[in-house]
Each structure stands twice: as C-alpha cells, then as structure tokens.
C-alpha cells in the first residue's frame, strides 16, 4: 500500500509492504488500511502500535512497531498518526520516490 509521506521539505510516494507477522498482529485486519488516506492510515497504525527506533552496530536504522490495540479510525490525533508514518520513513531515510519499504 502506498502513501505520499512528507518529511520537512521533501514529499515522497512510498509503498509500504507489510510482513505476514505485521498483518496478523494488526487488530481488525490489514484491509482497513486499503483506500485510507495517509493521515487515516497513520492514525490507524499509531493507535494500535508504538514505534521504537534504534540503530544497529553497523549504523542501519531499524524500526519496530510494538503493542496491540483496537485500531479504530478517528482515534488519537492525525498529527500523532502522521508522526508514525514519518518514523517509518525516517527508518528508511535513504529510500527514493517509488521505493518499497518492508514493515515487520
């Protein structure tokens, strides 16, 4: 699924590929992200998961979405939700427009 993600002055079209593990963890199913706008999708992701980012020994950025919860549209704020997508983007900061990002 793809969204346009804006970070600072850059705006990129990014495709997010959600792993089977993520798909099974997301309460309510991954289908609720289909057709959602970037802010809706971000809000859904944010409501159910909290992101933990880190850098490994080789300097690679990693992001892990932890937790579970009822993923319901309209919960929390759009700003918080967009921050979740922004963190996903920042974990793959070297990605270019049209690249695909795998989310575990």
Across the structure, where does each feature detected by a protein language model lie?
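Acidic (Asp/Glu-rich) sequence patches and key acidic residues
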Residues: 1-104
């Amino acid at each position: 699924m793809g969204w346009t993600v804006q970070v600072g002055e850059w705006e990129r079209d990014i495709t997010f590929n959600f792993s089977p593990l993520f798909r099974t963890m997301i309460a309510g199913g991954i289908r609720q992200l289909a057709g959602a706008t970037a802010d809706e999708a971000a809000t859904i992701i944010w409501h159910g998961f909290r992101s933990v980012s880190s850098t490994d020994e080789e300097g690679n950025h990693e992001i892990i979405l932890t937790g579970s919860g009822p993923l319901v549209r309209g919960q929390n704020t759009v700003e918080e939700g967009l921050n979740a997508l922004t963190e996903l983007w920042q974990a793959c900061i070297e990605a270019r427009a049209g690249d695909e990002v795998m989310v575990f």
